[in-house]
């Protein structure tokens, strides 16, 4: 009798061990950690910026799987400028500084990446590659510019696409055999790109360069564009260009931040120095949550520091909070 009981106990223990092993293997296959994505606004490397101060930002990006920024400049030694009011460029070492902080994804879908023509733009692509910073919103031709990037992070596929509604003009737009950015005014191509990215991604992030400079409120056509893009599969939309922080909304697991304003950029006005880091968390079951960590750009270093000012800047209360 005792031997039978012993055999039964061994069998039960064996089954328990097997079940435990299967459970462990199953848990390993299922992602348990949230994906963390930090997104900021405009970054350029003009001489007024104290680069040594940028290192202080590192701790705010340590948790990020993807740390995304709008590279509002060409990275080039090219001297031939496009004819426009402002032309921005920086050296390749600036990218190394950004990389050391944790930035690993740049959108180049804007009106300054082509400031030094096609050669300056191509230099920018090469320098980003050398720095180990991925990019979206542009490429050596239109196929690459519109295909976006898909990042495999903690068991989820995160698709990212940059869309230049405000761009550097007709010459800056990518073509079949020409380098350049996407063109947000080409609705059909943009919508096809979103649809294609949706098919290969668990989460789609869209980064439009749009909006009216200096405004705290999105315009009607930006709101309607966002709704259309969401209907095509965009889960997260984070804009830039206005040089101001605009409102953030999360409804029915769709997140939109109309503009993240400036980040590493110079301006004397408080409303243009008010900024933040949009810290997005995506759960294993694809639930989206966010926190806006408020900063203000220091007037001396042109690099942001923690501040509660940003939390009060919304479309609804801009009249009473704007400092002029």
What name fits each language-model region?
Residues 2-8:
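Sec-dependent signal peptide recognition
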Residues 11-12:
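Residue-level signal for mature regions of secreted extracellular proteins and peptides
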Residues 16-17:
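C-terminal motif of bacterial Sec signal peptides marking the signal peptidase cleavage site
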Residues 20-324:
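Acidic, metal/ion-coordinating pockets
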